[in-house]
């Protein structure tokens, strides 16, 4: 039975020192932890990997929401500023002054990166870019302003289109700004996350997102595999496993092109490739990069040994 994909939810409990533990503190209190991040993907511990306070939430996707600061009539960012919590279980964007937040599962994260600000100043030149797959909660919080599809557009053109929203999270203060919190900070302390302002905050959050995305990578693969095994979700042309090579002309004058209707795993069984191009040799390959400071399993063969 196919598992139901997690979706965004409204968070009613704000992360605090009472219900989460920073990652550095977790390592000190758990001496048996040997750095295996996969062991943290459970509900026994709620670990804080990154985040920050006094953030400004915006959007690159045309949408209407009272939670964003870059609308025609922006809200007071001091009243509706946001806090970001990157946990091992989910991402929480907490809306200060509203009393609730947005809980985002990692399966809904399509892309994350740092984006350079065109009008940035020293120590505040980056912001976080977070692309999320839309669901009912995101549609409620961020109503799309994009034009509706024309009635003449075929349903096939939108069958595999992922509806998304691009959020930007910008620090309010630079690394060099002198700012004092109204309350004593207990989570995002210097001992746990360093200065954690401005560009340092953005870099810390991107590293934390990368680690937590890896923790949940197997969950996404399992969902994709179950979706592929479901006959109702299969492609109509997936049973045709014979890809047709478009000819040597494309190889000489540009990148080779396959007229492929399958699932990109059907490079075998082509007569032109067998007889003309590969001449009985390998028909497909993969480029791999090995770093000098990492141990390799197996051995590497030179071209003369093949």
Curated annotation (Swiss-Prot):
Pfam families recorded: Voldacs
Gene Ontology BP, a term: mRNA cis splicing, via spliceosome
GO CC list: cytosol; pICln-Sm protein complex; spliceosomal complex
Signal peptide: none
Induction field: By cold.
InterPro entries recorded: ICln/Lot5/Saf5 (IPR039924)
UniProt superkingdom: Eukaryota
Presence of the UniProt keyword Cytoplasm in the record: yes
Record keywords: Cytoplasm, Nucleus
Localization: Cytoplasm; Nucleus
Transmembrane feature ranges: none
UniProt family annotation: Belongs to the LOT5 family.
Protein name per the record: Protein LOT5
């Amino acid at each position: 039975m196919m598992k139901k994909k997690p979706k965004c939810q409204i968070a009613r409990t704000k992360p605090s020192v009472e219900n989460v533990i920073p990652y550095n503190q977790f390592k000190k209190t758990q001496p048996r932890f040997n750095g295996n991040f996969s062991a943290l993907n459970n509900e026994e511990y709620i670990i804080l990997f990154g985040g920050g306070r006094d953030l400004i939430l915006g959007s690159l996707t045309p949408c209407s929401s009272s939670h964003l600061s870059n609308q025609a009539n922006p809200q007071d960012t001091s009243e509706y500023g946001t806090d970001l919590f990157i946990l091992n279980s989910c991402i929480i964007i907490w809306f200060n002054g509203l009393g609730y937040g947005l809980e985002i599962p990692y399966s809904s994260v399509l892309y994350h990166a740092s984006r350079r600000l065109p009008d940035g100043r020293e120590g505040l030149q980056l912001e976080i870019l977070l692309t999320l797959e839309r669901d009912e909660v995101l549609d409620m919080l961020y109503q799309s302003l994009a034009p509706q599809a024309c009635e003449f557009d075929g349903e096939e053109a939108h069958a595999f289109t992922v509806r998304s929203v691009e959020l930007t999270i910008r620090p309010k203060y630079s690394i060099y700004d002198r700012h004092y919190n109204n309350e004593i900070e207990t989570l995002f302390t210097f001992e746990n996350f360093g200065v954690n302002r401005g560009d340092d905050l953005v870099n810390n959050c991107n590293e934390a997102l990368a680690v937590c995305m890896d923790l949940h990578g197997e969950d996404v693969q399992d969902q994709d595999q179950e979706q592929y095994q479901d006959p109702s979700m299969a492609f109509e042309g997936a049973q045709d496993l014979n890809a047709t090579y478009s000819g040597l002309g494309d190889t000489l004058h540009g990148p080779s092109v396959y007229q492929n209707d399958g699932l990109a795993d059907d490079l075998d069984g082509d007569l032109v490739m067998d007889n003309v191009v590969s001449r009985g040799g390998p028909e497909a390959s993969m480029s791999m990069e090995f770093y000098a400071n990492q141990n390799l399993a197996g051995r590497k063969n030179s071209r003369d040994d093949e």
